[in-house]
């Protein structure tokens, strides 16, 4: 998962970094967003480096081999734990694509273009309207939403968001190419 997540975040960061270099207003608008996106990006890069440096995959494989030998050489353990690692691998393989797809969606929708989060911010208003119609409660929620929108637009640049949307949509489709009709 980390390589895909790093790639998605790097794609967003490339668009944001280029825009931030273009003018001071955009640099100020996107400083916190860039930082938020890059924190996990840097963490995952560090995790991958650490796993390689410590040869974690090789050590895991050696430990699994030792476990299988111990189990195989002990009848009681073999009856109880024989085939356990194979079953775990089968379960992991069965869910691997679902986990990947879930995290790809999260990276695209929740950490990608602000357009998605912006649209989602209206969900409460839609539900209130469906439940209570044109009520005072709906009007009050609408006023709160207006205040939220003012803060949103203060640090929003539609050109940057479109750039992120375009770049991430291409990545998203590339990663999902095997699932498309």
Give the role of each language-model region.
Residues 1-181:
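Terminal presequence/propeptide segments associated with secretion/organelle targeting
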